């Protein structure tokens, strides 16, 4: 019996993009279901009753939640090609550390910058840039975070690049000027079809955020 794979997601989610890239890397066929986060589907609430968030991967009727966990699950289940996690236990631990850092830092700091003004906005902007500078420093002179190969950290970070234009526009800074090595890494990642075919247009993401802000301000 063939695997039944369903992904509950929304197009602009950098977390959902992770699952899509991982599935593409493994060549897994799946059904994509776009969720409206203002009106969550009964299936999403059933499959992720704790957090009620996307993405959710449903594999043969069983839900897997949280994007970093989903990517690791995909790597373990479809392990016959394109390994994403390092084989060395120490390198695996380091990869998990940096993905945890990414997940605890970037989105919350961006939100702080986005939803504030004046001094707090500037503080959020400086903090966001410092996070990317730290990630750039961690990359060192390697082509990828997985050394010579595209791996777990690369996959989990590259999805944020589709939001860089939004960060830059709201923060009035340029990633190319602040983090040139990181942007060179983005270009390398975008050479992979699994990445370039998954990431949405950056200006489309920005348009969504502008509309979302208008909605929030009207309430």
Swiss-Prot record:
Domain GST C-terminal: 88-216
EC number(s) recorded for this UniProt protein: 2.5.1.18
GO cellular component: cytoplasm
Positions with a binding annotation for glutathione: 13, 54, 66-67
GO molecular function, a single term: glutathione transferase activity
Keyword Cell cycle: no
Annotated GST N-terminal domain residues: 3-82
Key word Transferase present: yes
Enzyme class of the recorded protein, top EC level: transferase
Stated family: Belongs to the GST superfamily. HSP26 family.
Function: Conjugation of reduced glutathione to a wide number of exogenous and endogenous hydrophobic electrophiles. Involved in the detoxification of certain herbicides.
PANTHER family for the chain: GLUTATHIONE S-TRANSFERASE U26, GLUTATHIONE S-TRANSFERASE, GST, SUPERFAMILY, GST DOMAIN CONTAINING
Designated name of the protein: Glutathione S-transferase 3
Organism lineage: Eukaryota, Viridiplantae, Streptophyta, Embryophyta, Tracheophyta
Chain's gene name: GST3
